Amino acid sequence: MMVAETSIVKKNHQIPRIINQKIAQKLIEKISMTDIAHQLAISTSTVIRKLNDFHFEHDFSRLPKIMSWDEYAFTKGKMSFIAQDFDNLNIITVLEGRTQAVIRNHFLRYDRAVRCRVKIITMDMFSPYYDLARQLFPCAKIVLDRFHIVQHLSRAMSRVRVQIMNQLDRKSHEYKAIKRYWKLIQQDSRKLSDKHFYRPTFRMHLTNKEILNKLLSYSQDLKHHYQLYQLLLFHFQNKEPEKFFGLIEDNLKQVHPLFQTVFKTFLKDKEKIVNALQLHYSNAKLEATNNLIKLIKRNAFGFRNFENFKKRIFIALNIKKERTKFVLSRA
């Protein structure tokens, strides 16, 4: 029996080659597999089969000199681990769990000589990673993400403000003013606007700086912690580790317990914070990658199969789109 053959369709297949190529191109985009199937007028199963054709082999013979660690939520209540090349943004690995055993078992598959080539690891302030990074990468410096260091300070200031505010009468003008303009206390004082606007709470035209001065006049305790908070922000943003930690050590026993907790954490992680101030590396690139991962997951309404999710991440982030130029045909 003669069977017609064509270069358009692979032998013993029904889906044209061009459709398979389109599926591969669409998988690079941050859209769901159901949407891909709908756009190409094929079944979702066909898209999944094409996804399963992708295979990503780990290269255990090399690691980048600078890499970033972070975690992301795969399913509700379950965090997964991700490592990225800091320079070219390629994903090094995506692991289903973030426990020390899971991470250790993966990186021990690399020879010690390969692991010793890693010089910098950027990460969030997640203490279980610290010892693990030192064990696996003995030559690497740990650099904490600057955003999360400032976030710790900001949260301490916010909690102190709330505690002081709750000591006031809830019907009082002072309570309402602090609650209404709480963002001014959290904001960097150098970024406060000096434009006058009518403020209903005070029934007059005031700048943000004038409002802040009124808020601080309601409580000496609030004023003291605000001034300390702003000084710490100033030294941190100016990358002055000696002044930053000098201020912490001088005020450790005098501040609110909420600030004491943060200060003790900073002193314990002093070396890693100094690295963050002296080196220009951060976890910002990996945070941006995590936002793309969240977008992939959200567009797909979540993933039940971790391997499929992992493949979508590698396809979207490690396979670069080829740029094509449109050529106008002449009539």
Where are these regions (language model features)?
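Short, positively charged, Gly/Tyr-enriched micro-motifs
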Residues: 1-67, 72-78, 115-118, 122, ...
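Active-site beta-loop-alpha junctions of metal-dependent nucleic acid enzymes
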Residues: 12-14, 92-114, 120
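Non-catalytic alpha-helical coupling and interface elements of nucleotide-dependent molecular machines
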Residues: 28, 32, 41, 52, ...
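Secondary-structure boundary/capping signal
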Residues: 35, 44, 91, 140-141
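Acidic/histidine-rich catalytic cores and adjacent linkers
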Residues: 51, 76-77, 81, 87, ...
